[in-house]
Amino acid sequence: MPRVEIEINPVNRITTDAIGPPGKRVFYILAENDEQTVTLIAEKFQIQSLSAGIEQFLVEIAGKFPELQEASPDYDQDVMEIKPPVDPLFRLTDIGLGYNADEDMVILVIHELMPDGTEEEPGIVRIWCTRSQLRALGHWGIEVVNRGRPICPQCGQPEEPEGHFCVKKNGGHKRN
């Protein structure tokens, strides 16, 4: 049996955000309805992957169900931002997406990252949302990820405000 098992069906709000300065940000996924709020810690690459996966997933749904109205990507930044303090339930390891055609609802199934050697079954959170809520989450996720440190055009690594050691420029360069 999972260490923790939560289902939010449906959510009033689902979002992701990063708190902290670029280079030291902590990424979160938050889901809430009138009864509960669940916050989970994620990695930047997980938010990037989720955002890309959401768009691909919604395109697949539209292909299977062409009669459905297109999901809106619109969001209100004030609603999408996560305000500290946050109390994360756990750090996530993976996210799965599913679709219930009868209800026209999407489910995110999120599993907990457990330390090596732990015998407990990982926690699981199931979040039900509309296709438009999911698409807004994906678009906002891209916005959040892109707010980080700029990427060096030479080596593809993040740049610090004071510059960085760039192997392709033989040592480094300062930002203007």
Residue ranges with predicted function:
Residues 40-42, 110-163:
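Mixed-charge, glycine-accented linear interaction segment located at domain edges/termini
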Residues 13, 26-28, 39, 94, ...:
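Beta-strand-rich binding-surface signature
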Residues 1-21, 68-124:
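Intrinsic, low-complexity N-terminal interaction/targeting segments
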Residues 163-170:
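Short cysteine/histidine-rich zinc-coordinating motifs and their immediately flanking basic loops
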Residues 37-41, 49, 55-60, 64-77, ...:
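N-terminal pre-domain and mature-chain start segments
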